Amino acid sequence: MAKVKVCGITSVEDALVAAGAGADAVGFVFFERSPRRVGVERAREISGALPGGVLRVGVFVNTPPEEVLRVASLVGLDYAQLHGDEGPEEVRRVREGGLGVIKALRVRDAGSLSEIERYPEADLFLLDAWREGLYGGTGTPFDWELAKRLRGCANIVVSGGLTPENVRAAIERLDPYGVDASSSLEEAPGKKSGELVRRFVSAAKS
């Protein structure tokens, strides 16, 4: 059964809705240009309110490894999702700091997936849609056919435009380790719809 991550959490209320729905992980976005950005103190408060067993993931874009590890320590993160142009060295340094690493890859064409080979120290790879100038939050799926050779891989998380209506199809097509959604589960940027979150998790785990 695919793991489910609900990203872009900005409040205790939304975090508890996600956890109650059965999400395996929640994501906190620390990228300053994101409408879903959350401050470190708020993320720490939310993290402390979550029940045990729910993974805490911090989303960073081109943040120095030392700062990633500092924030992770304060918030209590289990994973850093590196969603920018970080190279293998940055991944290695974060991993050596004792934090799990999810390296995001923006899928533009089949060649995008060859990037996986550059990051042997990443724990997981999150496949997201490519859009010029955007680091996540595109709200659109990538071409799943491009990733069919990765079907069943134990280190792939599918993201990008997943909804309660299409997440089951993505899982059946790619059989990933996990799925991730953010903007498609919102009433407004940074505010989750409890109904959409519950439907998404239910569909993913059906």
From Swiss-Prot:
> What is catalyzed by this enzyme?
N-(5-phospho-beta-D-ribosyl)anthranilate = 1-(2-carboxyphenylamino)-1-deoxy-D-ribulose 5-phosphate
| Domain of life from the UniProt record | Bacteria
Family annotation (InterPro entries): Aldolase_TIM, PRAI_dom, RibuloseP-bd_barrel, TrpF_fam
**What top-level class of enzyme does the UniProt entry assign?**
isomerase
**Keywords, alphabetical:** Amino-acid biosynthesis, Aromatic amino acid biosynthesis, Isomerase, Tryptophan biosynthesis
- In Pfam terms, one family for this protein is PRAI
Name the coiled-coil region(s): none
Q: In which pathway does it act?
A: Amino-acid biosynthesis; L-tryptophan biosynthesis; L-tryptophan from chorismate: step 3/5
GO biological process, alphabetically ordered: L-tryptophan biosynthetic process
What are its E.C. numbers?
5.3.1.24
Q: One MF term in GO for this entry?
A: phosphoribosylanthranilate isomerase activity
The UniProt family comment states: Belongs to the TrpF family.
Q: Which PANTHER family match?
A: N-(5'-PHOSPHORIBOSYL)ANTHRANILATE ISOMERASE
Descriptive protein name? N-(5'-phosphoribosyl)anthranilate isomerase
Q: Which organism is it from?
A: Rubrobacter xylanophilus (strain DSM 9941 / JCM 11954 / NBRC 16129 / PRD-1)
Q: What is the lineage of its organism?
A: Bacteria, Bacillati, Actinomycetota, Rubrobacteria, Rubrobacterales
Whichever gene encodes this chain, its name is trpF
